[in-house]
Amino acid sequence: MTTNNPVCASDAHMEMYSSKLYTSALFLNLIIATTSMILTGFAIQKLFMESIINISTRMFLFCGLMCCSLHQTAYIVLRIQVIYQVFFKLSEPCNLYYPAIDCKYVTFSLVAGNTGMIFIQSAMTIDRIFATIFPKLWPKLKYWPGVVLSILMIACNYANVQIIFWGDPLTEYVPTCGQFPSKSVNRFQTFLAIALYMSIAHMVINVIILYINVLQDRQQSKSFNVNQRYQSREALKSSQAIFFLSMSQFFACLIYSVFTKVFLEFQLNLSPLQSGLVLALSYTTPYACIAIPSLIIFTFRFIKNQRLRNINELRSQTETGDECMRKIAKIWEK
């Protein structure tokens, strides 16, 4: 339940709503969010149309894109709300703020989108660990690792969001739905610190896995078993793709975590206009949600080209091996 007495916007907040620079930043946010949704659509099409990496990895990437879409959808709704305030409600300063309870789904979706991308990163890392430890067994499981780990991480993400907002009655009024409820801020900051350590762990583990896969590929490249060499190359390419995407997500999480912690720490020292402009121009997740689908599209194209080159190399190596065996047979017959 919210209080029956709405809060009127202060002169400082009215300055923010009236700022043409702030309004321009809002439209820029809309353009960025809309662009990311379009790129996400192309990336999802790539995931479904091209099977150049294993199905589990594609499932994780799909879940990551869904987290981006969840965040960006809420972000678009948020920005449209503020633009509506700017154009149609400036004459009603006591009717500008939103009850926090009415912003529940927008706020929860923004947080769930951010935290979901971190948990999906964990799922991809766990999958690569088992694929490296059990190189023969893991491919035979097909899509099951992706299904199980995706469900597990989605459940963890849902539980995490509930814990962050646990016991918060959401009774206050907020200038925009993007403003974090004051009673949940401490738990959210705690998760940001944990998420940063999680991302560092993901990076270290993926570097180790990539190194192991390179060694495995070098060993298998000497084998005459084409299937083993092909599986080894596939594992290496999947690890390279996940390492590349994990690296980008790591930096996105690092920047997001540091930015959010610093912003929450110094927010009270900023005027509403300064605070609004900082959030509108420096909030990193919308940019990350443009980068991730773009990187997926680029990575798929790169792997596809590499795969074609590798297949041609394997064919030429197989012919060379057969010729060698024929020569040995001729020598033996003599």
From Swiss-Prot:
The protein's name: Serpentine receptor class alpha-11
One of the record's GO cellular component terms: membrane
InterPro entries registered for this protein in UniProt: 7TM_GPCR_serpentine_rcpt_Sra, Nematode_rcpt-like_serp_alpha
Family the entry assigns: Belongs to the nematode receptor-like protein sra family.
Keyword Repeat carried by entry: no
Function: A G protein-coupled receptor required for olfactory imprinting a requisite in ordorant response such as benzaldehyde and isoamylalcohol.
Membrane topology: Multi-pass membrane protein
Cytoplasmic face of the membrane: 45-57, 127-145, 213-239, 299-334
UniProt tissue specificity: Expressed in interneurons AIY and AVB in L1 larvae. In adults, strong expression is seen in AIY and AIA but only weak expression in AVB.
UniProtKB keywords: Membrane, Olfaction, Receptor, Sensory transduction, Transmembrane, Transmembrane helix
Listed GO biological process terms: detection of chemical stimulus involved in sensory perception; olfactory learning
Keyword Transmembrane helix applies: yes
Cellular location(s): Membrane
Result of knocking out the encoding gene: Worms exhibit olfactory imprinting to benzaldehyde and isoamylalcohol.
Transmembrane segments: 24-44, 58-80, 106-126, 146-166, 192-212, 240-260, 278-298
Organism: Caenorhabditis elegans
Gene this chain is encoded by: sra-11
Record-level Gene Ontology MF annotations: G protein-coupled receptor activity; olfactory receptor activity; transmembrane signaling receptor activity
Chain ranges on the Extracellular side, renumbered to this chain: 1-23, 81-105, 167-191, 261-277
Source species, domain of life: Eukaryota
